[in-house]
């Protein structure tokens, strides 16, 4: 059994799908046991830079801002639910291209102690054995990674 307090900062990665949310109860239990901070991490992937000018010209910038605001509200809603359970929770929203790379950079830069993520997400199967985000994160971070399958939730 792990010593209490081993994990101080725990990240759960979310992509807005119900699949990714299935990792939350596992992360919350570990955070509660360790009295750790739980960080809800979402990477927002904007349109590719080569299309950004076209999007702005087409008047889509407002729609992108609305989408970003919806994501923020989604994360804040989850944070508030978890705070109601007496957990120390914060939200981290990163904007950029290269989801796995951005997740790894954040985890390594912030000295995260544990990563909890689902093997399924918005793209369907995470292709764990074939180079999906979960595998890239496992290979790119120093922290242990707990993978949650949908049927484990």
Tell what function each PLM region has.
Residues 1-5, 80-115, 152-153:
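Structural beta-alpha unit
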Residues 11-12, 30, 38-40, 74-75, ...:
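Short, structured motif recognition centered on aromatic/hydrophobic residues
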Residues 23, 50-53, 101-104, 127-129:
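Short, well-ordered secondary-structure micro-motifs
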Residues 58-73:
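A short acidic, glycine-rich active-site loop
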């Amino acid at each position: 059994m792990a010593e209490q307090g081993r994990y101080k900062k725990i990240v759960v990665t979310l992509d807005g799908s119900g699949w990714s949310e299935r990792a939350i109860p596992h992360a919350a239990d570990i955070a509660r046991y360790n009295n750790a901070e739980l960080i809800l991490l979402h990477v927002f992937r904007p349109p590719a830079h080569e299309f950004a000018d076209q999007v702005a010209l087409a008047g889509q910038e407002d729609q992108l801002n609305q989408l970003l605001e919806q994501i923020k509200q989604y994360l804040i809603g989850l944070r508030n639910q978890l705070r109601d359970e007496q957990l120390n929770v914060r939200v981290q929203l990163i904007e950029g291209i290269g989801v796995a790379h951005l997740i790894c950079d954040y985890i390594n830069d912030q000295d995260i102690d544990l990563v909890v993520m689902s093997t399924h997400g918005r793209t369907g199967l995470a292709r764990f054995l074939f180079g999906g985000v979960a595998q890239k994160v496992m290979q790119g971070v120093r922290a242990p990674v707990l993978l949650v399958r949908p049927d484990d939730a």
